[in-house]
Amino acid sequence: MPSLSRAGRSKSRGYNARVESHPYARLTPDVVLDALETVGVRGDGRLLALGSYENRVYQVWRDDEPPVVAKFYRPERWSDAAILEEHAFVAALAEREIPVVAPLSHHGRSLHEHAGFRFAVYPRRGGRAPELDRPQVLEWLGRFLARIHAVGAVDRFAHRPVLDIGSFGDAPRAYLLEHDWLPADLREVYAGVSAQALDGVRRAFERAGAFATLRLHGDCHAGNVLWTDDGPHFVDFDDARTGPAVQDLWMLLSGDRAAMEAGLRHVLRGYEDFRDFDPRELHLVEALRTLRLVHYAAWIAERWDDPAFPAAFPWFGTQRYWQDRILELREQIALMDEPPLAT
């Protein structure tokens, strides 16, 4: 019988004790409300946990004012300087009337601390998921992403990471292999297939050549875009980093190759109203998808002692989970050798 992965054995290895000692176990409703009082936000006692795993995010109701959203940052993930760089980038976008949700300032500060937790407060913005199958929606998103990138190209991040093969591919792969996350009978298979996949990523980066990099949203998928009758607004710049422009475009595309090419044409039609796009970056689309797949598995593994993760990802670490990841990477190896998407 194949051995279970680390996630599958967690309960028998003192998992519950680790959960109880996780820093977020101390983030009680009282701590949240007390923290907000320190920056002049007086809640009426009602909190709604919103769908965030990396951080803890709450909608907070107030007696006589509209609700706000409070984000409590994951301890030890970002330095203060990195968070403030994110805030400054979003503020610069907002100043140019680009539809983003910037943190509120209290006495000139957007990053606050209480009881060992750093947090920021945002205005609440409603909206629905964008309809990415509609050409006009894709063009609209393309126009605003070009404006975000135009601002992103003006300056550089000094304290936030670069999207590269080492940090998004090699390091996550090494973590999974070195920390006993793979079932014994799949470990060598995953090691071989993931190595092949990252070799394919390197070849794709070589084909793209010396592409430009800039400050990005970094995680621009449909869940981080809220749509209203007035159009989109972009939320959650928590993964903002330096990288190629196409990183903020490819996650808006879905379906088979023909559907992705059609979607790309609509995105670029809007994008190029405001900014040129380097077509060499299209060599990176499947390479970036491959890096995201490897990174995502390690992201879950590294946070498994956070009680939100086993609850949200109960299938993580099972035999079937790793078999599916191996199959995905094999498919990516083939896709990375195909010609880039046509525009």
Question: Language model features by range: what are they?
Answer:
Residues 2-105, 229, 341-343:
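Conserved NTP-binding catalytic cores of kinases and kinase-like/nucleotidyltransferase enzymes
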Residues 16, 20, 180-181, 298-343:
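ATP/Mg2+ or Mg2+-diphosphate-binding catalytic cores
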Residues 51-70, 103, 199-249, 253:
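Active-site acidic catalytic loop and adjacent metal/ATP-binding pocket
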Residues 62-157:
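ATP-binding pocket architecture of kinase catalytic cores
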Residues 75, 119-132, 175-181, 296-312:
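A glycine-centered beta->alpha junction motif in the catalytic cores
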Residues 75, 127, 232, 240-242, ...:
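Activation segment
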